[in-house]
A protein has these predicted regions:
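Extracellular jelly-roll beta-sandwich "head" domains, especially the C-terminal globular C1q domain
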Residues: 18-164
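Short, Lys/Arg-enriched N-terminal segments with co-localized hydrophobic residues
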Residues: 1-24
Length: 164
């Protein structure tokens, strides 16, 4: 079938619009290699895809604000974070952990752990989680270094998608 206007009984039918909800997506990145201290957020320096008013971010900050702008009881977002991680030169070789944090609290269900064999040995991590924001409220989400030492983060990518 055609998805355009056609004559039906002498009337013109307007074109069909297919909404795939991709207008509610935002992507924030940091292509540089940055040192992130233990317990701190990964800074996001570029906005690859700007979101609508329900996703708010300030360039260079590590925090993204999700707003519950909805007519339903809650707005649901899918939040994902990926990066390459390594222990910097001079650090102790041990497990590296990073997690998504909601309002500053790391999520155990969205924690990535890798154990490198040596310093400067990069591994790729990716975590994702669904976040529900009550109508009229706001939550902050971030990617946090939950390791016990400073970690290098390279090519960080933070994606927020409004799913309902």
């Amino acid at each position: 079938p055609r998805a355009d206007s056609a004559k039906w009984g002498g009337a013109t039918v307007p074109p069909l619009s297919f909404f795939e909800r991709n207008d509610f997506m935002a992507e924030f990145t940091n292509a540089n290699t940055v040192s992130v201290a233990a317990g701190q957020n990964v800074p996001l320096t570029e906005t690859a895809v700007a979101g609508k008013g329900c996703v708010v971010h300030r360039e260079g900050a590590g925090i993204v604000t999700l707003r519950g702008i909805t007519n339903q009881c809650k707005a649901r977002f899918k939040v994902g974070f990926g990066a390459n991680v390594a222990i910097p030169t001079g650090g102790t070789v041990e497990a590296i952990t990073a997690a998504l944090a909601i309002n500053g609290e790391p999520l155990n269900s969205a924690t990535a752990t890798v154990t490198p064999a040596a310093v400067e040995n990069f591994f790729n991590i990716y975590v994702t989680s669904f976040v529900e924001v009550p109508r009229g409220c706001c939550l902050t989400v971030a990617a946090e270094n939950t390791s016990t030492q400073t970690v290098l983060f390279a090519n960080a990518n933070f994606v927020v998608e409004r799913v309902s």
